[in-house]
Regions:
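C-terminal segment of classical bacterial N-terminal signal peptides
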Residues: 15-25
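Short, charged juxtamembrane terminal tails flanking transmembrane helices
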Residues: 246-249
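A short beta-strand element within beta-rich, extracytoplasmic domains
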Residues: 72, 82-94, 218
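A short, hydrophobic C-terminal helix/tail in secreted or cell-surface proteins
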Residues: 226-244
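Bacterial N-terminal signal peptides that target proteins for export
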Residues: 1-13, 228-229
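Beta-strand-rich interaction/scaffold domains
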Residues: 95-181
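Flexible, small-residue-rich N-terminal segments that precede or flank a structured functional core
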Residues: 24-76, 198, 210-215
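Proprotein-processing/basic-patch segments
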Residues: 171-172, 176-224
Length: 249
């Protein structure tokens, strides 16, 4: 009996060591995600555009500022994944030739998108509906931002120079860090604020929203290390069965 147990122990150890010596293959994968929520904050106050075709960042001709909010559901990325790259693609559908540095800032609190839908080109916004985000409210009419204009990290995670109508991509290590922290659960995912800090009137850029054909796209590349092989575990169970059978005899 002791001899059988000793043999089994040696086999288990050898199999376990060999299993540890087998390199684990890192699986690379990617996802392409559409926004699940977006909106525009209009500096005029209780205006919004939750269900509009566009969102805005920058100042209109009268010098009033707009900021956009974006959120993506990262549920398609598995737990434990290592984020390798992040790229946000946005379509500018209307803008003048002024160069504007538009930054993506990680949002620090939750916010809403409701049924408000501005008229015409949507740059003027419309009266907010219940649950909309506004310049003053994260959720209209009952919940205020801590800071008018939205609660977000003062440091941009990524910045892109935007001129006229075109497709633009934001990509940086800062975006990788944001998505990694959201996937890990170390911070809550409230998305990003799109901020154009230009003080020039008429610097606003109009972007296509998720309700538009050319909607925002978030591309994420990640890697996952598979769970260790079960060969060693099976060998342990097999030996246990052999020992128990022989003991029963």
């Amino acid at each position: 009996m002791r001899k059988n147990i000793a043999v089994c122990f040696v086999v288990v150890v050898l199999l376990g060591v060999s299993n540890l010596c087998i390199p684990q293959t890192v699986c690379a994968d990617s996802v392409e995600l559409g926004a699940v929520r977006d909106n525009t904050l209009y500096e005029e106050g209780n205006l919004s555009n939750g269900s509009g075709d566009f969102f805005f960042a920058g100042r209109n001709g009268g010098g009033s500022e707009r900021r956009a909010l974006l959120l993506f559901d990262l549920g398609a990325i598995p737990d434990g994944a290592t984020i390798e790259s992040v790229a946000l693609e946005l379509t500018v559908s209307q803008a003048n030739s002024l160069v504007a540095d538009v930054g993506l800032h990680r949002l620090l609190s939750d916010w809403g998108e409701s049924t408000s839908d501005a008229n015409g080109g949507e740059g003027g916004g419309i009266e907010a509906e219940v649950g909309d985000a506004t310049w003053l409210h994260s959720f209209y009419p009952g919940t205020l931002w801590s800071n008018p204009g939205g609660d977000f990290d003062a440091t941009a995670s990524a910045t892109q120079s935007v001129i006229g109508p075109d497709v633009y991509t934001w990509q940086s290590s800062g975006l990788v860090a944001d998505v990694q922290s959201w996937v890990d659960g170390s911070v809550d995912n409230f998305g990003w604020a799109l901020v154009n800090d230009s003080l020039v009137s008429g610097s606003a850029k109009r972007f296509n929203s998720r309700d538009n054909a050319a909607s925002p796209i978030l591309r994420v590349e990640f890697s996952v290390v598979p769970e260790p092989s079960c060969v060693a575990l099976l060998s342990v169970l097999g030996c246990a069965v052999v020992v128990r059978r022989r003991k029963a005899c």
